[in-house]
């Protein structure tokens, strides 16, 4: 699915349910990754932290704020 297929840069995948992602709201860091507005991104990705005012960067799908 979209979460388990997220780019993790070799780190173990951290699977979180969509209801929990929604409940977390804005940026909440977890080991190696970042959750914000329903998105799930790698903070260490080449294009930087996904947790900005728009949620994920344009290269990461973010159902909370950007169309996929």
Swiss-Prot record:
Query: Where does the entry say this protein is expressed, by tissue?
Result: Expressed by the venom duct.
UniProt-recorded Gene Ontology molecular function terms: toxin activity
Q: Which residues form the propeptide?
A: 1-21
Question: What GO CC annotations are associated with the protein?
Answer: extracellular region
Q: Please provide the record's keywords in A-Z order.
A: Disulfide bond, Neurotoxin, Secreted, Toxin
The domain section of the record reads: The cysteine framework is XII (C-C-C-C-CC-C-C).
- The name on file for this protein is Conotoxin Cal12.1p3
Species name: Californiconus californicus
């Amino acid at each position: 699915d979209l979460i388990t297929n997220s780019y993790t840069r070799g780190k173990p995948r951290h699977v979180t349910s969509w209801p929990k992602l929604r409940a977390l709201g804005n940026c909440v860091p977890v080991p190696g990754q970042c959750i914000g507005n329903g998105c799930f991104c790698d903070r260490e990705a080449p294009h930087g932290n996904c947790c900005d005012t728009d949620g994920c960067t344009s290269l990461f799908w973010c159902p909370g704020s950007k169309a996929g």
